[in-house]
Every structure is written in C-alpha cells, then in structure tokens.
Amino acid sequence: MAYPWTFTFLCGLLAANLVGATLSPPVVLSLSTEVIKQMLAQKLKNHDVTNTLQQLPLLTAMEEESSRGIFGNLVKSILKHILWMKVTSASIGQLQVQPLANGRQLMVKAPLDVVAGFNVPLFKTVVELHVEVEAQAIIHVETREKDHARLVLSECSNTGGSLRVSLLHKLSFLLKCLADKVISLLTPAPPKLVKSELCPVLKAGFEDMRGELLNLTKVPMSLNSEHLKLDFISPVIDHSVVHLILGARLFNSEGKVTKLFNVAGDSLNLPTLNQTPFRLTVRKDVVVAIIAALIHSGKLTVLLDYVLPEVARQLRSSIKVIDETAAAQLGPTQIVKIMSQTTPMLILDQGNAKVAQLIVLEIFATDKDSRPLFTLGIEASSDIQFYVEDGLLVFSFNEIRADRIHLMNSDIGVFNPKLLNNITTKILTSILLPNENGKLRSGIPVSMVKNLGFKSISLSLTKEALVVTQASS
C-alpha cells in the first residue's frame, strides 16, 4: 500500500497552481437586459396584460376625477350624456430594459397603445380616441435582514411626458367640440390607471420571472452516485448585466454534503458578457469536483492476462529486464490494481485544459498473493475536452501520460521506476483511460441554459473557469 507521507511532495507540486485563488463566485449566471426583457414580456403575456388594458375603466376614472374638481357638476352634465365608453383595442409595445446612470439599477419601460370609443345620444357616430402612455418601473437589488438580497421591481408609474390623447378620425365641428371636452376630462385618468391597473400586473409578471430564475438554479445535477446542487446567494446588477451569484454543494449517495463551495471575500470578480445574451461561469474548483465525482470508482482490479493478454506479456517482458525471477512469478492470474490517490487537479489555460492525477499502481504475481511485487506512485496527466452532446455537458480525456513514476515499495528490491515508463503508460491507457471516459461520457445536464430558451451553446475556457455561452450562428 502507499503511505500518505510519500505523496506529500507530489501534492505540493500539484497544489502549486492553487496559490493566488480567485475571488470569483463558484458559479455565476449572467444575463443581458435583452434576456430580462424577453422573460418579462413573456410573463406579462402569461398574465394577459392585453386583457387588463382592454378592461380599463376609463369612464369610471373620468367620473372619479371630475368629482374632485370645482366644476364637478358641469362635468357630470357632460358625462351623463355618454351612453358608453370602452376600450376597443389595446396593445403593449416592445419593452425596454436599460441601465440607469448609477449602473446598479435597470429602468423598465412599457409603451401602451389604447383605442377607446364612446357614443352620445345626439350622434350616431362612435368617437374613437387614441391613448398613448408609457409605464415605467425600476429593477434593483434589495437587501433585507440577514443580508438576504433579492431583485425587486418598484417605483412603478407612468413616464412623465409620455401621455398623448388624440382623435383617431376627423369629426364634424360640433362633435369635435364635445370630443375635445371628453379628452380634457380623460387626460388625467391614464396615469392613475397605469398605477392602479397595470402596475400590479407588471409586478406580478416580474415576481414570476424572478421565481423562474431562482428555480433554474435549484435543479440538482446528477454525478453518478453523487449530485451537485447550486444555491442562490445574491443578485448583482452591473450596468446592463444581471448576475446571479451561486454557491454549490456536493452531496454523496447518502445525501450528506461532502464539499461546500462559497464566495471568498467581499469584492467579487464578475464576468463580462462580451455581447452574448447569457454566460454561465463555473469556477475551476467546482469543475474539478464534478470531474472527480464522475470518475470516482475506488480501486480497479483487473486479471491482466485474461483481459489484456498482450499487455500482460509486455509487462512480463518489462519486469524481466529488472528481475527475471520476479517476471517468472507472473502467472495467468496476475492482477493489476489501480486507484486514484487524490482528487484530480484541473489546469486551465485559454482554450486548453489538462487534468493531473496521482495514481497508485500495484502489481500482484497471482490472485492468491496478499502483497504486491511492487507499488508505483504515478503523476499522470491527460488533456481534457469539453463538449455538448444531446443537451449534456460531456467531458473526455484524450490520452493519459505517466509524467513521473515513483517506486513506493517493492518486494523485488529497489529499481529505477523509469524502466517501467512505457508499460505503465500502456496499462493506464488500456485500463484506466477507458474506465474514466466511460464515466465521464454520462455528462451533466445543462437544463439551466435549456430552460432559458437557448438550444445551442458554446463552451470555452479561461484560466479560472469553464464558460458556457450561446453558440454563434
């Protein structure tokens, strides 16, 4: 067996790249204002905002407004001649979501277009009025007790100077005079109706959107016998980008937390979108935990002569160079045992990734032996690829290399382990590599991105993270 102290210097070598850890959050989902706009527009549609506009109580609002004025009786005398007044058509234009100057708030604007008709007994013509008004509200981050932060929508009202009420068609002189009086009575009503009728719908749609964003982050990711769960920590608005800061927890098969990923420090290093609608940034240590959970298998035990007879023959020849007697002991039931000594380490560069593993390799002459002929400690590395297949984020090791080999213990005397470099690489390539790739191929679902409505995605690497964005067309 391998002794922990023997690997101390190996761990030091692999851990050197961890010096100067980043202050980036474990996972960040970054959304552009375009995504926020589309999601909010869909939620308003779900709440049937058009029907709300069509049901606007214009006549009631005019009556309430007139009762407050000094000419109330005169106004009422005009209004009582209106047989009916209702919205005949209504629509909400394209939403606008833009950052405010402070870079920490977003302004939402919703242009409303309403056609209202009314009729009076003296005229058979239906008079149609065109009402244009714009609703606006502010999206910002609200921090409550226990530092709990959330996105909220507030200060909903009409945009100053956006109200326009006009005749839709030309009218006779007398009818136009009446229509002008109705317009003057109607003008104060739309801003108040925006606040009383539309703002509640806008807030309800926003709450639905916020809830959907939170639900996106709560879907657990299965990693063979383990699973990864993301935890919403806080939102951050940075000019035209909304960042959802996420922590992560790794659970074992018994549901116990085995690893916790948190935000380190108060100053966050947040990603930029670079003209993409969204960006999912997964910190390096989280990616390492995912890979480790996928490939974790304990110890591999292989009857080498039975499974890989040619490799068994090459092993016998390689050992014969060191000790002919030991080579002669290798029988048809010779066993190779392979196990990973530590969690793999991920080394990222722009566009490239490499995984380093510490591996213990034991060679037993027969299946009856309790002690190995020798034990090797191997510093192995593999180039790793990330790609998307059938909605899954898939990892794959291209090859495996025995970069350094150390003799841990030996029953055949001390020898230079470099003599076994070729056969060691052969064994790892033939046994460990397909085993690990088979487990990595199960992949992890990228449902968070799929549920946002993005069907094609692209993967890239930085020195600190794996990045998921929309694929370029």
From Swiss-Prot:
This is BPI fold-containing family B member 1. Disulfide bonds join C156-C199. InterPro entries: Bactericidal_perm-incr_a/b_dom, Bpifb1, Lipid-bd_serum_glycop_C, Lipid-bd_serum_glycop_N. Its main location: secreted. Glycans are attached at N215, N422. GO terms for biological process: innate immune response in mucosa; negative regulation of toll-like receptor 4 signaling pathway. It is found in: Secreted. GO terms for molecular function: lipid binding. Residues 1-21 form the signal peptide. May play a role in innate immunity in mouth, nose and lungs. Binds bacterial lipopolysaccharide (LPS) and modulates the cellular responses to LPS. Coiled coil: none annotated. It comes from the Eukaryota. Belongs to the BPI/LBP/Plunc superfamily. Plunc family. It comes from Bos taurus (Bovine). Keywords: Disulfide bond, Glycoprotein, Immunity, Innate immunity, Secreted, Signal. Gene3D superfamilies: Bactericidal permeability-increasing protein, domain 1, Bactericidal permeability-increasing protein, domain 2.
